Amino acid sequence: MKLDLTVLEQARLLVVGDVMLDRYWHGGTSRISPEAPVPVVKVGESEDRPGGAANVALNIAALGAHAALAGVVGEDENADLLAARLEACDVSTYFYRSPEIPTITKLRVMSRNQQLLRLDFEESLWEIDTQGLTERVEAALPEADVVILSDYGKGSLNRVETLIATARGAGKRVLVDPKGHDFAKYRGASIITPNLGEFEAVVGPCPDDATLAEKGERLRAELELEALLVTRSEKGMTLIREGHAPLHLPTHAREVYDVTGAGDTVIGVLGLALAAGHGYPEAIMLANLAAGLVVAKPGTATLSIAELYTALHGDKLAEFGPIEESALIDAVRAAKLRGERVVMTNGCFDILHAGHVAYLEQAKRLGDRLVVAVNDDASVGRLKGPKRPINALERRMQVLAGLSAVDWVVPFGEETPARLIAEVLPDVLVKGGDYRPEDIAGGEAVMAAGGEVRVLNFEDGVSTTAMIDTILDREG
C-alpha cells in the first residue's frame, strides 16, 4: 500500500463548521490566592490560534493543499483576528458575520504547560438564521474537491442536511466530524468520523471489535454512508466499509501530550488524502499517523509535510553516496519535503581532476543537495571509444562520493540521462560547457516542473582527454 505525499498539494478542500478562536494565557504560578484556594498566575505571554473548524482548515493548509473555510462569526475584533491569521496561512475565508453573536472564543490559562482553567465566550447559534452561511458555501463549492463538515455542536451547522445535499448534488465527497446523539442528520454524507464515546452514545456499548464492527455496519447502512471511521484513542481506529472486512489500525502515538484538536487533524488529513486521489484504507492510514504525531504537541497544533514524510519513511531514508535510481527518487522527494533545494548534473567523470572538483563545488553552491548521474561503462565506451573508460563505474562512483560537494551518485546506461532526470526532477539541472539550456538533456522536463537549467563554465586547460593524451605522450 503506497502513500504518495507529493500529490497532497494538488488537493482543494472546503471546511464548513463551528469556527473558534483558541486563546492561551501563559504564566508562572508560585502561590495560592489569599482570596480563595486557587493558584495565582502571573501572565507573561498571550497566544491566539484558530480553533474548531478553523484548526481543520489550518491543518490542511500546513500540509501544502488549498483550504477554504466557511463559518459563522461575530462582527467583532476576534473575527478580524481569525480572518487575518487564516489568510496569512493561505486559508481562504468565507465568513458569515452575524450581529447576533460573538465569535466563539476559548481562553485557556496555562502554567508550566498545564491547563489550569478554561473560560468560554460564546452564545448558542442554534436559533440564528444561517442562510448566509449556506450562500457562502455555495459560492465556495466550485473550487473544492472535498467538503469537510466540522461539527462542534455550537449551531453553525443547524442546516447540515441542506449542506450535505448541496455538496453531494454538486458531486463533492462530504466528510463529517459529528457531534451529539443524533447522527440521522448526517444521512447521505460520504463518511463520518465519531470517536468511540460518540459512537457508543448512539449505538450502545461495544465491548469488543466484533460488536463494534457489527453495530458500525448497521449504522453505516442506515445512514447511507460510503464508510464509517471510529477513532478509539489508545486502541487506534476502525474503518467500516460496505463489502469489506473492518480495518483496525493501532495507534501511532508514542507520547500523548495534549489531545486538543486531534480530531481536527484526523478529519483534515483524511479529507486531504481522499481529495488527492487516495482510497479509504490509504487515507485512514495517513490520518492515523498524523493523529499520533499531533497529540505529542501542546494545544491546537498542525503538522508539516516534512514531519509526516519523516514519520512515514523515516526508517527508509537513503544514505548519502552511491545509490540506486528508485532509492534516489525517494531521497530527493524527502529532501524537497524538508525544504532542501536539489541540484543535479551528469557526466562520465572517468579520471577525476581539479576541473571536475571546481565544477561540482560550483554546482553544489546552487542548492542544498547535489546529485551526480554517471555514465555506466558501456555508455562511456559508446561516447568516448572502445578504450574508455579508464576507471570502471564502481571506482568512478566511489571517488565522486568521496567529494564533500556530492551527496548522491547514481549510474545510468542510456545515451543521455533525459529519462533519469525526468524521474528525479531536481530543482536545478546543471551542465558544463557551451550548451544552450534548451538543448540540455532532461532540461525540458525540469523546466516544465518549475525548475531551472543552468550552464556552468569548465576550468580552462583541464580535461580528462587532455590528461590521457599527456600520459600517453610521456610513455611514448
UniProtKB/Swiss-Prot annotation:
It holds the Pfam family PfkB. It catalyses: D-glycero-beta-D-manno-heptose 7-phosphate + ATP = D-glycero-beta-D-manno-heptose 1,7-bisphosphate + ADP + H(+); D-glycero-beta-D-manno-heptose 1-phosphate + ATP + H(+) = ADP-D-glycero-beta-D-manno-heptose + diphosphate. GO terms for biological process: ADP-L-glycero-beta-D-manno-heptose biosynthetic process. The keyword Transcription regulation does not apply. InterPro entries: Bifunc_HldE (IPR023030), Carboh/pur_kinase_PfkB_CS (IPR002173), Cyt_trans-like (IPR004821), PfkB_dom (IPR011611), RfaE_dom_I (IPR011913), RfaE_dom_II (IPR011914), Ribokinase-like (IPR029056), Rossmann-like_a/b/a_fold (IPR014729). The keyword Cytoplasm does not apply. Its EC number is 2.7.1.167, 2.7.7.70. Keywords: ATP-binding, Carbohydrate metabolism, Kinase, Multifunctional enzyme, Nucleotide-binding, Nucleotidyltransferase, Transferase. Pathway: Nucleotide-sugar biosynthesis; ADP-L-glycero-beta-D-manno-heptose biosynthesis; ADP-L-glycero-beta-D-manno-heptose from D-glycero-beta-D-manno-heptose 7-phosphate: step 1/4; Nucleotide-sugar biosynthesis; ADP-L-glycero-beta-D-manno-heptose biosynthesis; ADP-L-glycero-beta-D-manno-heptose from D-glycero-beta-D-manno-heptose 7-phosphate: step 3/4. GO terms for cellular component: cytosol. Residues 344-476 are annotated as: Cytidylyltransferase. It is an enzyme of class 2 (transferase). The active site is at D264. GO terms for molecular function: ATP binding; heptose 7-phosphate kinase activity; heptose-1-phosphate adenylyltransferase activity; phosphotransferase activity, alcohol group as acceptor. Catalyzes the ADP transfer from ATP to D-glycero-beta-D-manno-heptose 1-phosphate, yielding ADP-D-glycero-beta-D-manno-heptose. This is Bifunctional protein HldE.
